[in-house]
UniProtKB/Swiss-Prot annotation:
Gene Ontology MF annotations: integrin binding
Segments annotated as VII repeats: 327-367
Source organism: Homo sapiens
Protein name (record): Integrin beta-like protein 1
Lineage: Eukaryota, Metazoa, Chordata, Craniata, Vertebrata
Alphabetic keyword roster: Disulfide bond, EGF-like domain, Glycoprotein, Repeat, Secreted, Signal
Amino acid sequence: MRPPGFRNFLLLASSLLFAGLSAVPQSFSPSLRSWPGAACRLSRAESERRCRAPGQPPGAALCHGRGRCDCGVCICHVTEPGMFFGPLCECHEWVCETYDGSTCAGHGKCDCGKCKCDQGWYGDACQYPTNCDLTKKKSNQMCKNSQDIICSNAGTCHCGRCKCDNSDGSGLVYGKFCECDDRECIDDETEEICGGHGKCYCGNCYCKAGWHGDKCEFQCDITPWESKRRCTSPDGKICSNRGTCVCGECTCHDVDPTGDWGDIHGDTCECDERDCRAVYDRYSDDFCSGHGQCNCGRCDCKAGWYGKKCEHPQSCTLSAEESIRKCQGSSDLPCSGRGKCECGKCTCYPPGDRRVYGKTCECDDRRCEDLDGVVCGGHGTCSCGRCVCERGWFGKLCQHPRKCNMTEEQSKNLCESADGILCSGKGSCHCGKCICSAEEWYISGEFCDCDDRDCDKHDGLICTGNGICSCGNCECWDGWNGNACEIWLGSEYP
């Protein structure tokens, strides 16, 4: 059996769906009409009274002048999808500001599009406490973005929460860490967001159909289907999954800023010249080990050379497989990914850099240097990429003194991360500095809060062996560039 009022509930739901987006005041009774389209059971005066704000005299605007009155219910005019105006159409906006996914940050109530904050909180989204019990260090730590920058350099930190710089009143800088800047979407000519042909989200324009460009400034004269067809590569992928399709043309992801066209090219980005480069080729403009021609990612070798990358001379008495095996040593890569293998012998790169050496280039003394270029913190010597510390010092880079001049309490206070946990629970504290667990080689950072597995790899090596992983980002050594320090921008070597 259906519960009492079920039919009336269906009538109400049908009425609301028919009317569009609307709101129902608490005084509304679902039995005011017997069925949709039936005569109203209220008098005209009573219907209009219910559509006026309390205390307003007869003759005052119904539904605040923003809707029509239908049997005591305001049917509000919908100006934009997602914008509502309340039971009596009294609100200009219905949706309130959010912070970290919560309306009014969970510290207030939404009233007509504006947050009414609980006592002890303030801000557009009630996100700022009036009294702060955090230390400045903890507060700043909570305000750092994934690049370890406080409020993305676009705001100030207030008790662990970012207050974005919107002094011009535009409100275009926002986000938990002020990481979004919608000023980037303003078209220079029209001064409109996305040229008036799209929506901006976190500094990026999302264009309406038929428009494209960084700021939706260009109009496309072909259909989306035709655009997709022109961008489809021979293997059936859009721009070979290595580019972006814009109005039927592929813009390939250029990974080599020094190249004339980059390593990826072709009408549908089907050619990847990186497949022609040996590890050591990145030190020069050579493809195919300097002994062949690269044609759309495949090497055509000169006479006297063979191999996938023309790396093996036919004059060598070893087979290509034997040559590579001799050059690998204990590494999975020939010459440890740091040199050129030719007939079973390694030539370490960059040439002339004495910090890279060994039979299979297994020693890399650059690993003993910190980001400032200091070897073993100035308290040790480097031996095959590892620090041998002087007496009284220890650590991967000899950065920790064995003697400490502070109390245990002082030391622990300096080792607490933003959440109050000592070294993020992944290390021990010594003299105010965290020593991350040796068992988990990938844990690093001031508070052991970073995971070096997040750093990009190339040729199977983190940061390609040409930089240091710092909190998930590669810090490249001089002469190197790229997300994984895979691009050589230094001098060309013979």
